[in-house]
Amino acid sequence: MFCIALVLAACSDPKPILRTDLPKATALVLYKAERRMYLFQGNTVIKEYDFKLGFAPIGHKKFEGDGKTPEGQYFIDRKNPNSQFHLSVGISYPNAADRRAAGTRSPGGDIFIHGTPRPYRFFFKDWTWGCIAVSNREIEEIYAMVDIGTPIWIYP
């Protein structure tokens, strides 16, 4: 019985490590085609990460359920320490232009940069519904380095 408890404990998602020793980012810049994210402090890149996108990654998000990740200028508008994807930081999609472009359809929302649903899980292909996914270790760093209000530019 004790061995089963140890195995189950080893498989559970460990508590996020909220680091305080990292510099604060003043901006995030993402290039979807390259799957590359850069965290800046002023004009200096202080961290960079690879990421995965939605299941239909090409093009700007137009409506809920299209599997696309938005493109354009947004900002970090919330942080979720209780995310089902380890930790997450919210992106301010949709903005007024996104809502107009969606017309009568819902533009969707709840676009986040987040970790994975299980520890040590690695994805070889795009898998989200439009979010930006990194490893759990990486989202712990990003979560600590960005504040609400940090601007984010997402390029094709």
Please give the residue ranges for each predicted region:
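C-terminal motif of bacterial Sec signal peptides marking the signal peptidase cleavage site
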Residues: 8-10
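Exported/periplasmic cell-wall-interacting domains
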Residues: 17, 23, 78-156
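Post-signal-peptide N-terminal segment of Sec-exported extracytoplasmic proteins
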Residues: 28-55
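Sec-dependent signal peptide recognition
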Residues: 1-3
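Short glycine- and Lys/Arg-enriched binding-loop motifs that mark or flank ligand-binding interfaces
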Residues: 50, 61, 68, 111, ...
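Short, surface-exposed loop/turn motifs at beta-strand boundaries within globular domains
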Residues: 21-23, 30-32, 44, 69, ...
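Structural motif
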Residues: 34-36, 73, 110
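N-terminal post-signal-peptidase region of extra-cytosolic proteins
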Residues: 14-26, 53-77, 93-96, 136-137
